[in-house]
Amino acid sequence: IFTDREKANLHLQAGAKKVIISAPGKNVDATIVYGINDHLLSAEHNIISNASCTTNCLAPMVKPLHEQLGLESGYMTTIHAYTNDQQLTDAYHPDVYRARSATHSMIPTKTGAAAAIAEVIPELKGRLDGMAVRVPTINVSLVDLTFNAGRETSIQEVNQIMKKAAETELQDVLSYCDKPLVSVDYNHIPFSSNFDALQTKVNGSLVKVMAWYDNEWGFCNRMLDNTITLLDANNHDTPIISAALSSAKGQQKNL
């Protein structure tokens, strides 16, 4: 409801100090994917967007691969659990696809998650596009990314790039898995992106990679992370609140 600047500003007018939109936002001060561009948050930002759960999964995949291999162009498909934007039985919806029963069909539909990558990694503007297939599962989704790299590579190199990223600079938002897991195994996992090393395919410079994500719980964790970061950026008598949120964050990740 409050996903554009005009409507989100109503919260500020009512006395709120900051607004974090839990969805892609329009004309916001910044779109932040925690772990990727949260260092840009400042006290001047009053209305920010946490992007989408899918963008939060895709960005930690794309960043290290682009830095090491160069991403020339790519297409993403998210195999996405159904959400409350869909109908449980066939009924009216502005999107004819989403008017169909979420529990009875696989439903192709649109997503802006791939294009939104440019808002957090500007050099990728125009290089990525994508679509979604909504499936009749309650939770946990999968990003399937195919891209043309700037040079030839191998399965081993791609997996090593992702493993290193998950162990170092992206350790808070990216996990690496080389076990034969399925969607239910990632339920209630707090990471934005869980890279599935067993699904990596390479043909010269053509690369396919996949990552799982709990599209509810993982995204909620990033909302909390960005809230803490925004509080720290403002530094207006918030150390007690920030410390309490940090403690809550630690408890959540241990669940």
What are these regions (language model features)?
Residues 63, 119, 163, 225-228:
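Generic alpha-helical structural context detector
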Residues 56, 153, 217-218:
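A generic structural signal for alpha-helix starts
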Residues 1-99, 201, 223-225, 234-237:
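N-terminal Rossmann-like NAD(P) cofactor-binding subdomain of oxidoreductases
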Residues 49, 104-105, 211:
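A short N-terminal beta->alpha junction/helix N-cap motif
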